[in-house]
């Protein structure tokens, strides 16, 4: 299992890469974006020393996520990515080829308990 923590200004989230019933899934949630469609992309380097400028070229398109009117995206995507090959690389959230937020993909402890996703209600709480 792998995890990427996104913490870039108002944009925050947790994205997990994990096998579920024999298929690899991308699960998580992101808050702080405007309503619309965004892309999840794996990049060559896990170097975020200069923000998303230093993560290198895009390598793998994971899929699109939709942010609702409350600024929340719930992520549940299938992927063919071999999880062991993406450890140490970066994941970006992009729109129109602009990298809005990114984080490094790391190894995560496998926990059989329920994953609590970030949630927000209509009052912004």
Swiss-Prot record:
Cellular component, GO annotation: host cell cytoplasm; virion component
BP GO annotations: superoxide metabolic process
Keyword Disulfide bond attached: yes
InterPro entries for the chain: SOD-like_Cu/Zn_dom_sf (IPR036423)
Gene3D superfamilies xrefs: Superoxide dismutase, copper/zinc binding domain (2.60.40.200)
Stored SUPFAM superfamilies: Cu,Zn superoxide dismutase-like
Disulfide bridge partners, by residue number: 52-102
Principal place of residence: virion
Alphabetized GO MF terms: metal ion binding
Cellular localisation: Virion; Host cytoplasm
Top-rank taxon, per record: Viruses
Annotated keywords: Disulfide bond, Host cytoplasm, Virion
Role, per record: Superoxide dismutase-like protein with no enzymatic activity.
Membership in a protein family: Belongs to the Cu-Zn superoxide dismutase family.
Protein name per the record: Cu-Zn superoxide dismutase-like protein OPG175
Organism whose genome encodes this protein: Cowpox virus (strain Brighton Red)
């Amino acid at each position: 299992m792998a995890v990427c923590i996104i913490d870039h200004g108002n944009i925050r989230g947790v994205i997990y890469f994990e096998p579920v019933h024999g298929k690899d899934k991308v699960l998580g949630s992101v808050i702080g974006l405007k309503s619309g469609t965004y892309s999840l992309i794996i990049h060559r380097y896990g170097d975020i020393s200069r923000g998303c400028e230093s993560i290198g070229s895009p390598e793998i398109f994971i899929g699109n996520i939709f942010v609702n009117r409350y600024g929340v995206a719930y992520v549940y995507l299938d992927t063919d990515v071999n999880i062991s090959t993406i450890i140490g690389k970066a994941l970006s959230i992009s729109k129109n080829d602009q990298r809005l937020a990114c984080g490094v993909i790391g190894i995560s402890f496998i926990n059989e308990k329920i994953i609590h996703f970030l949630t927000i209600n209509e009052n912004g709480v």
